[in-house]
């Protein structure tokens, strides 16, 4: 229980923008108190915002009561849960976790997995690192193909989103050539430089990406000098995403991005006519309404340029001094602000380009110091973090499903020290999936487009609940948003309960058949209850 402190006969606020742990204060002291001088009242208010934290599981704590109105449909789901795979050295053949990570990707059977060869490792993501000349070209896929074909084989039979997100540095006007490490595993955080393309028509950048697509779909391509390069590869690319986080990279303006998007789309469409296209990939969508508005306006595009999808990202980011006791507020408060941003972007999309679909393809959390100061094994990541991060993702997924978002992608398959270790779904030390992965697998296994989201209430605590009517029966998603246990009363006796919590660790969800209507959710637990 949380105590709201009364100062001088007035109830102190139960929430503070600077002290997050006070959210949810409900139980107050009696209001009959002696007067307190104003100076003491102000001092006391600074000292005691919340005197007692919630005591989950205390005998006098009432159970959270979940009720579901199965006949009241909120929305028919359009939402697919999935993940992204970001290229880094841990995915290379020979890596100690290569096989484990690939097995985890195959086992999840997710649709619309996003594949992103991203700029920090230029030799692993840019197949033409030097500009062409009359003497020849630098096209070389030898380091890139092994990881890319691993991905395409692991996801064979499912639609994917491909995004070779990095424009070669030499295509931009810079004071001097941009250097990159000789070591393929070497980091180059400064590889992205310049703001203006050396070819303002954007034909050069469009042709570059078209050749990459031809390499993987048409068996090869002809380079700038007329020489044929053969790959023997004939994969399909259902969706091509055009660049990534352009609001952070190259100081890209809305007009610049739209011109580059149109040029790339036109070039790729010529060589892969069935491919659909995804735009924006915004890193900070709440700050980029002007970019969204400009890009979604068809009048700013070439005639006939398709805008099949837009995409954008969200990461919860607690402050350095925070702990699990404050993450429980920070993660979900920031998630709610992101959900408000989504509603705003949806209003723009529906007004300007209603046929365009949405992929929120990087959802996660990042702890302070990641990646910059976490260059070695980071003992500062407590096990409970993975549960908190998983709970946050499940909460965001369900609320995005309520808004009709098409794809919700968790970030990312593999991170490790120096490359966002707190974002990983697979333990970089042993290749085993962590709690974030198992939460995603619960969602992939249980919730699909076509399910009905129905009116669901959870009263008396901090558990989030959402009922889904599915072709196989009824399913209930439960998320404990707090760092304390919660007792929950469900309308589901005899249901099969699958749970990810601190006790499951890096193992698969625990499964049990309920013998009563009451369940106990550990801190940051995520569970599904399913029955016919």
Regions found by a protein language model. Name each.
Residues 282-311, 363-388, 417-419:
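Substrate-binding cleft/loops of secretory-pathway carbohydrate-active enzymes
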Residues 8-13, 18, 23, 28, ...:
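Intrinsic, low-complexity polybasic segments
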Residues 317-374:
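Glycoside hydrolase catalytic-domain groove-lining segments
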Residues 271, 292-309, 337-352:
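Catalytic-core regions of glycoside hydrolase
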Residues 54-242, 248-249, 253-285, 301-306, ...:
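Non-catalytic accessory regions flanking glycosidase/transglycosidase catalytic cores in CAZymes
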Residues 30-44:
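Bacterial N-terminal signal peptides that target proteins for export
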Residues 43-54:
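Bacterial N-terminal signal peptides
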